[in-house]
Amino acid sequence: MAMLPQEVIRKKRDGGRLVPAEIAGFIEGLADGSISEGQAAAFAMAVWFSGMSRDECVALTLAMRDSGETLDWGEFGRPVVDKHSTGGVGDNVSLMLAPIVAACGPVVPMISGRGLGHTGGTLDKLESIPGYNIQPSPELFRRVVDEVGCAIIGQTANLAPADKRLYAIRDVTATVDSVPLITASILSKKLAAGLQSLVLDVKLGNGSFMTDPAETEILARSLVEVANGAGVRTSALITDMNEPLADAAGNALEVENCLAYLSGKKAGTRLDRVVMAFAAEMLAAAGVSAHKAEGEAMARRALESGEALERFGLMVHRLGGPADFVERPEAYLERAPAIVPVAAARDGYLAACETRELGMAVIALGGGRRRPDDRIDHRVGLAGLRPLRTKVEKGEPIAFVHGADRDQAEAVAKRVATLYAIAEEAPAQRPVIASRLV
């Protein structure tokens, strides 16, 4: 006989280990509505306090994956690979990575999310492109993945519906920051997409959700161990988020930055190092390259030949965007009416910045959400962000604020200027790839 929901909650509350059948039964009730919100909240709090073993977390992830539709790409006969980022500022890596990796052979069915807190969302960026459909029919999604090799869309109602319900409850019960629940939430959606391999970008620094290195490693290790335990070959790179990754933060501005990157104009930057590291990791995981050096060379060829840019343009068009978007982005991406420079406060070197607050500045401009139903102004944000260790003179622009009106842009520019520390000497170079976990 199935265990009553309250007995599952009691067992976990008291520190017991749940068996897969108990977890599966509870999650099935979450998906079909027989578990109440109060019971779901109590379960989440019990997990928050008592934690979960790796095997429990694998069972939770698989149960949430199986609560809805799971995709199968076997008929394509190509490796299926994806990447997930825990989020940061100016992190538009997915936009470039999907077409680069697809140009090398694997298929990349990327199911992405919206902005959360101070971080930007891949879907919000793509919606700055007129006509781009983030919720295509399953048939169109499969057709685009087959023809182009990649498609970036949003989560459908049929993928991991139990996670959608549990996350909404966690959001209002102070249980968002539970490593087992974060792990199962992220991975259930990714595993439902039918992946064979997954690479995780776990951010560390003052622009990430987890600023403590020990906590960051715990989350990264949990994600890697549980995903591998669930049968998906997975690795993680812990990457630096103590400054924006791209030189822009904001939706249309990051799409513009993506096109510049795919056109070969950002080689040698921190952004380039991250994109190439993840492309190499994904290609090796997919078995397309024998080792990472070969994978990076393949990715570089896809970039320099223009094939990755061509695939990005094809993906945009197949999903409803303009056919000539990559040739004429200025005709389609809206520009903010007010652009105001951010002046360096004094001579010296850019030594540090408050990255999270830079993300909040984009939200203040209207480029992100304070509430789930807020409308986003895709035009606004920060551009021309100078990297740390840059030598500047007093009054020299270190960024440009793109705002809906001049008063707003000037107010945000003054705020942004205070978020940078300028020192007499350049700070030590911080590695952009901090570590790798498998």
Swiss-Prot record:
Pathway(s) served: Pyrimidine metabolism; dTMP biosynthesis via salvage pathway; dTMP from thymine: step 1/2
GO cellular component, one term: cytosol
Keyword line: Glycosyltransferase, Transferase
UniProt keyword Glycosyltransferase present: yes
The enzyme's E.C. designation: 2.4.2.4
Highest taxon in the source lineage: Bacteria
Pfam families reported for this sequence: Glycos_trans_3N (PF02885), Glycos_transf_3 (PF00591), PYNP_C (PF07831)
Coiled-coil region list: none
Presence of keyword GTP-binding: no
Cross-referenced Gene3D superfamilies: Nucleoside phosphorylase/phosphoribosyltransferase catalytic domain, Pyrimidine nucleoside phosphorylase-like, C-terminal domain, Transferase, Pyrimidine Nucleoside Phosphorylase, Chain C
Family: Belongs to the thymidine/pyrimidine-nucleoside phosphorylase family.
Assembly and binders: Homodimer.
Protein name as it appears in the record: Thymidine phosphorylase
Species of the source: Sinorhizobium medicae (strain WSM419)
